[in-house]
C-alpha cells in the first residue's frame, strides 16, 4: 500500500496496512527547528538551513530526504498568506536562535 492509498483507506474508516504517519504535513503536526536539528544529528545527517513553515513558532519543513528516511506518508503545502508573506525580512539570526520582530516591534 502506498502513502496515498494508506491515507485514503484510513479516511474511509477501513484498516490500512499501517497507521498513516504525518510529520509536518501541517503547522500543527510540524517540528521545531531545534528538534529538527537534533533529529538530523541523531540520524547522523549534517545540519540544514531551516525552511520555515511558521517562523513565529519556529516550525520548519523537513527535507524530502528526512521525510523519506522516516517513511512519512504526508507532504505539506505552505503558501505564503497575507499574515506571513513578509516574515523573512523581519528575521534576525542571534546565534542560537532566530528573532522575529512584528510590525509593532514585538519579538
Locate the predicted segments by residue:
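Catalytic cores of TIM-barrel enzymes
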Residues: 1-107
